[in-house]
């Protein structure tokens, strides 16, 4: 698809809509030519097994934000502000920028991911507050070699999500993550070999604060810039959260790595038993995006 008419479709949504519902035996690959596509994109649950592959410079953008009015004069809300919604399982995206262009206006989501078994490779997620919403409690998501930027709680939600070799960039003081992991869930957010950087004006950043009491976030072998505060972790102003969250690090390095000064309710892991990427994402069906890439397809009976 291309904006200049050289493809089969002019918009990404037109291409998505053309995919047969529940096409279970094969993946559908959509090539997005270079360009900025301003549209509120929805990938519904029936459009399974889709791969979106972008040329360099393929940008999907919109300018919604929580306090913006919808057609009925109501506030969009955080969930309604997203530029892109992904509900279809076994979705794959590569080399695409997902952007919310509304600026520093409060909650403004770039990508809302509700589907299970979602894989992003070499993608960018641009925004300020609440950039990436890992929405569903049943969702597993894998981010590889991605760039994610924001200010406050810019990676947040209920899902189990792995971030492998990602670049996480803070634009202002705030919080990198705000997980809302369910009680009893084995994994929340796990970051492997990621690099955390910041704009010069961002000097007071926490790794996480718990949106819900049983939040989980683990940083493994990550390089932390000096913008990360020595205490590292925040309890969202609720002392009782310190008894229920699971916040941990393993072999953090860089100017922001300060294990001796970390919050007392956080942990320094002694080993990685149970924290292999394949274990974190396996679920009951053995999903392994590292080995299988985007070849897996949904089986619908």
Locate predicted features.
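Sequence-level preference for short, compositionally simple segments enriched
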Residues: 1-301
């Amino acid at each position: 698809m291309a904006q200049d008419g050289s493809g089969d479709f002019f918009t990404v949504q037109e291409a998505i809509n053309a995919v047969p519902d529940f096409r279970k035996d094969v993946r559908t690959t959509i090539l997005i030519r270079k360009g900025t596509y301003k549209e509120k994109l929805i990938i519904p649950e029936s459009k399974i097994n889709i791969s979106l592959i972008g040329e360099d410079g393929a940008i999907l953008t919109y300018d919604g934000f929580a306090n913006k009015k919808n057609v009925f004069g109501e506030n969009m809300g955080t969930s309604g502000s997203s530029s892109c919604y992904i509900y279809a399982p076994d979705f794959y995206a590569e080399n695409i920028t997902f952007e919310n262009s509304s600026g520093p206006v409060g909650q403004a989501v770039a990508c809302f991911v509700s589907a299970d078994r979602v894989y992003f490779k070499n993608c960018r997620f641009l925004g300020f507050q609440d950039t990436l919403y890992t929405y569903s409690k049943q969702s597993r998501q894998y981010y590889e070699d991605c760039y994610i930027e924001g200010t406050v709680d810019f990676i947040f939600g209920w899902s189990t999500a792995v971030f492998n070799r990602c670049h996480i960039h803070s634009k202002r003081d705030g919080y990198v993550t705000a997980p809302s992991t369910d009680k009893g869930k084995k994994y929340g957010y796990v970051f492997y070999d990621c690099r955390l950087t910041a704009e010069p004006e961002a000097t007071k950043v926490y790794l996480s604060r718990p949106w819900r009491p049983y939040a989980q976030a683990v940083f493994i072998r990550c390089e932390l810039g000096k913008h990360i505060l020595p205490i590292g972790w925040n309890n969202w102003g609720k002392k009782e959260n310190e008894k229920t969250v699971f916040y941990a690090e393993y072999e953090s390095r860089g100017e922001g790595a300060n294990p001796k000064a970390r919050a007392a309710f956080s942990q320094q892991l002694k080993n990685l038993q149970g924290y292999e990427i394949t274990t974190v994402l396996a679920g009951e069906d053995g999903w392994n995006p590292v080995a299988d890439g985007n070849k897996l397809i949904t089986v619908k009976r």
